[in-house]
From Swiss-Prot:
CDD domains for this protein: HATPase_MutL-MLH-PMS-like, MutL_Trans
Transcription among keywords: no
The protein's name: DNA mismatch repair protein MutL
Pfam families for this protein: DNA_mis_repair, HATPase_c_3, MutL_C
Record-linked HAMAP family: DNA_mis_repair
Record keywords, A-Z: DNA damage, DNA repair
Function according to Swiss-Prot or TrEMBL: This protein is involved in the repair of mismatches in DNA. It is required for dam-dependent methyl-directed DNA mismatch repair. May act as a 'molecular matchmaker', a protein that promotes the formation of a stable complex between two or more DNA-binding proteins in an ATP-dependent manner without itself being part of a final effector complex.
Domain of life: Bacteria
A Gene Ontology BP annotation from the UniProt entry: mismatch repair
Gene Ontology MF annotations: ATP binding; ATP hydrolysis activity; ATP-dependent DNA damage sensor activity; mismatched DNA binding
Family designation: Belongs to the DNA mismatch repair MutL/HexB family.
Gene Ontology CC: mismatch repair complex
Amino acid sequence: MPKIKRLPDEVIKKIAAGEVVERPYSVVKELVENSLDAKAQNINVYIEEGGLGKIVVEDDGIGIPPEELPDALLRHTTSKIASFDDLYYLESFGFRGEALYSIAAVSKISIKSRVRGENNGYELIAHAGEVINLTEVGMAYGTVVTVSDLFFNTPARKKFLKSGQTEAGLIRQFIEKMAILYPGVKFSLFIDGKKIYSSAGIQEQLGLLARFWGLEKGNLLMLEEKLGEGFFIKGGIALPPAGKPHRKLQVFAVNKRLVKSGILTKAIDDAYESLLPTGLKPLVFLEVVVPGTWVDVNVHPQKLEVKFMDEQKIYLDVRTIIRNKLVNAKSSSLKSFSPARETNTKSEDNDYWQVTYFAEEFSGNSDKLLEKEDIFSTSDNLTFSLNKDFAKELNFQVIGQFSLKYIIVEKNDKLLIIDQHAAHERILYEKYQTKLNPFYSQVLTFPVRIKASPELEAFLQENYQNFLEIGLHIEPFGPGEYLVREIPEDFPQNNIANVLEEYLYEIMEQKEQVSFREKALKLFACKNAVKFGEKLTYSEMTNLVKELFKTNYPLSCPHGRPTIYELSLTEINKKFFR
């Protein structure tokens, strides 16, 4: 049996570094936070090759005295705290003394710094944490940290990184968030020699938020509410119906520290309940300021999560304030939506089914039911083979629509409950499959601008040709933004920007091992299919069921979800002990 023994110092260093430095973004985050702790008013960030080639962070902060420079690379050396109790009164980002130690352990690092009152600065050079040189240099006041060859001594770490473009995108998004959180500090970001982002540093948070979300200032509401001694809520929110189909542009901060918080996410979702169209997430930039004794910031290696002492109070106060602000906002853009998931025909006081329409018998050929314009009509005269006996005959009777989600059908002594969205998805998918090209494009009169996360930005560039082949012409329009000039001719016309963003993210995140075109076909059918919550006429329900029974695979949607739940008369009789 192996003996217990101490790990070599080199291994300990690399393990510790891995907890703090996961990727180039981690390096930039730690260095920028150090600059802010040093009271910097100007912070410039330069990256090459997504940060793997070089990262430079320069600031005009208070600097590091030359006699302290070697100590800066030692583990658990810090100027931020002196005792454990100081953790409850933190006014800085750093406190563990691990950031520079961890970065230096997996890179080649240079730290140049000059404090006020000194004629010159000093430069410390280290490789893999070992000091190589300390020399006097000429430089402006402040600190410049240069990190080169990141992970040069841990090559396995590089294998888990995304493309350089994705890494650069994560850094850009971080800088944008910090510029909003610290509007009085001027931030600049340079990627491969090109200036990508800069803020003015003039305490103008509203404009920075509008730019970050791609919205007009009039669609935003700024917040600053005092809820108690040392307890504030600050930031900004987007007024409904503005929203995104994802949470990537939601930002939370606690005591000036960017964090992820399930409690704050839940509070925001509940505050926006019924005010946003189904499928959209709120746009929020929320900073919670609380006394240090209310929160534990030492629960995550990268300080990305915090723990509130009284989570219920935080949840209730945040939800109430945001909800009241939204409801009372005097904006013409604020109107209430009833999400489809909450729309139902069930009474609050009576637990019984209530159907929207009652049936006439359908024998497969009744012209009078088709007088209204039919959203499920099939003019292509396509012939489908059937794969189930019950679907071979078109004799059935639609009973009605339940909860604006399901169609209730009687067929051959069976009760069928049909998912209207999944059924229409199957119909459209097979219809598109038979078309020579279901993705004929149409040129938009006014191009649509969309915001792209770093991951989506890389995905769009890698699949430019694939998107052209499915009728989407998307081109770059500045950092993190794209213009959509052409869309497929059958693409939904309402709320194009949000539907398109959702469509793109879903294609990107699909893990199914099928072709790009196949993924696009399935999602295209999904986006065009009738939704839960849509009221259907008797004619529309009848034709939807008829066309479903004509498909090759009527029992499931293209993604594999069932379309039909079947109850036999025998099963129903048993429930009534007959």
